[in-house]
């Protein structure tokens, strides 16, 4: 349906199915009274600006780059723009992490069907705002590893990394260079995580960790949940564990509560970021 929508006292829009076709500018001439009761403004149109660069019917669809967009059951091949997910720059070391892709569909003569399929060949529900379509979430959330591994390209031993990282931070990890040669296999060379681990192992502070012993069992109260899956080859999870130590003859807990970010690199899971838990 075509509607005329007032923007402000001088400007109007001609709208078809939530799309602006024309912008109309007017100017005030006079106020007139009808039947001695009703007053109205008399206005003159000063300009009519068409807004038809994209045609009568058009859409914007924003989805992860690993998803497929179909318009009228035809696959749309290339997005108009691609942007990184916000606050996840460390995930972009290769092609494992998807981008947010926006498709501008222009020049249609009638409303067409819009369908989006994720990388697991499941149709996903879209949220419409005028002529723009987005997803409620641009990732999959599950609470357990058993659920998460259904969406991942292969299994990953998260606890193996978490235990070794915890030991590395208290100078308890076996291997050359205070365990650096052991832990570095989990990182992509040249990334911030790789540099952070190298600097810790080769700096002076690691030599001043408190003298302590590890209890048996070393790790207790372990929790692994809150998985966010960005693609088959990129995800994050929340981890909690308590490392049991004896310091100066007294029991002491070293708590690890972090979000760990993984991507696949050359077929191997790597850690690209660790953020402190809340």
Regions found by a protein language model. Name each.
Residues 35-50, 124-158:
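Extracellular beta-sheet/turn segments enriched in Thr/Pro/Gly and aliphatic residues
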Residues 88, 93-104, 110-111, 126-138, ...:
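Short, charge-rich amphipathic segments
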Residues 1, 66, 144-218:
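Core segments of small alpha/beta cavity-forming domains
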Residues 2-79, 84-86, 92-100, 104-109, ...:
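Exposed beta-sheet edge and beta->alpha loop/turn motif
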